[in-house]
Amino acid sequence: MEMNIKFPVIDLSKLNGEERDQTMALIDDACQNWGFFELVNHGLPYDLMDNIERMTKEHYKKHMEQKFKEMLRSKGLDTLETEVEDVDWESTFYLHHLPQSNLYDIPDMSNEYRLAMKDFGKRLEILAEELLDLLCENLGLEKGYLKKVFHGTTGPTFATKLSNYPPCPKPEMIKGLRAHTDAGGLILLFQDDKVSGLQLLKDGDWVDVPPLKHSIVINLGDQLEVITNGKYKSVMHRVMTQKEGNRMSIASFYNPGSDAEISPATSLVDKDSKYPSFVFDDYMKLYAGLKFQAKEPRFEAMKNAEAAADLNPVAVVETF
């Protein structure tokens, strides 16, 4: 079921004028009630975005499309007869930016494409950190608090998932990407403005995320829900397949470092913490097997692990 409801679109340029307070309130409301919002006038160069879109689509046609078709045949998905619930209808590859880049390890990327993605990644990293400080301001946290938590000892992790969702002859049989919440911190999505498909779960109904040209869609991951003690939410989202059109998706994940210690911010805890404390890498190990399930059991499992550690401290043997 889909709802006719106004998805939050936020003009970031208004932070510099008389509408700053109103814009900050819109961001806060979106984080509390949607877990998603769409940015316009975000400062990313439109010509850079256009070039990346062109090169991503060209790269898929030249280097990925045939591999995708072979994958369909190998999994028996080229003739869909029954509903498939354990595979996604997508073609993807990943670029890692932080702590170490793999940009020059990816085969078949032109030098122009590499340089554009390097530039785009750096600009998105800056935008992500600016957004984290805006969240701090709305939450009453010290500027830089979220960035510091994400840093760990070696800095945040930052990577980009480049996806194409090709036309599907029977979209009712398979999802482009199954419903899930994102495990990490802040996700910045540059999506196709002509082919839709991204939906989020809002009050029990699936809502389309509108494809707007040159916009950046923001969504919150599980770690921000934990750090804000549930004030801000990560939400379930999915990608629907389409009979026509190849949907491009470039999602960049600004996440905590692997050894970052995640816990609810003290100032956001009234009595008891609703969420566990843990090391980010431990959560990711759990998430790997439970991605397409509800987030609550993951939080509960981490809470149980935390309680077990408190009950069974490591013994210290003193020698004299």
Swiss-Prot record:
E.C. numbers: 1.14.17.4
Function: Enzyme involved in the ethylene biosynthesis. May promote stem elongation by maximizing the extensibility cells, possibly by activating ethylene biosynthesis, in response to very-long-chain fatty acids (VLCFAs C20:0 to C30:0).
Keywords (A to Z) from UniProt: Coiled coil, Ethylene biosynthesis, Iron, Metal-binding, Oxidoreductase, Plant defense, Vitamin C
Residues annotated for 2-oxoglutarate binding in this entry: R247
Superkingdom field: Eukaryota
Induction, as annotated: Accumulates in response to very-long-chain fatty acids (VLCFAs C20:0 to C30:0).
Protein name: 1-aminocyclopropane-1-carboxylate oxidase 3
Reaction(s) this enzyme catalyzes, per UniProt: 1-aminocyclopropane-1-carboxylate + L-ascorbate + O2 = ethene + L-dehydroascorbate + hydrogen cyanide + CO2 + 2 H2O
Binding-site list for Fe cation: H180, D182, H237
Family membership noted in the UniProt record: Belongs to the iron/ascorbate-dependent oxidoreductase family.
One Pfam entry name: DIOX_N
Any single Gene Ontology cellular-component annotation: cytosol
Signal sequence segment: none
Domain spans labelled Fe2OG dioxygenase: 155-256
Record has Cytoplasm as a keyword: no
Pathway the protein acts in: Alkene biosynthesis; ethylene biosynthesis via S-adenosyl-L-methionine; ethylene from S-adenosyl-L-methionine: step 2/2
Enzyme's top EC category: oxidoreductase
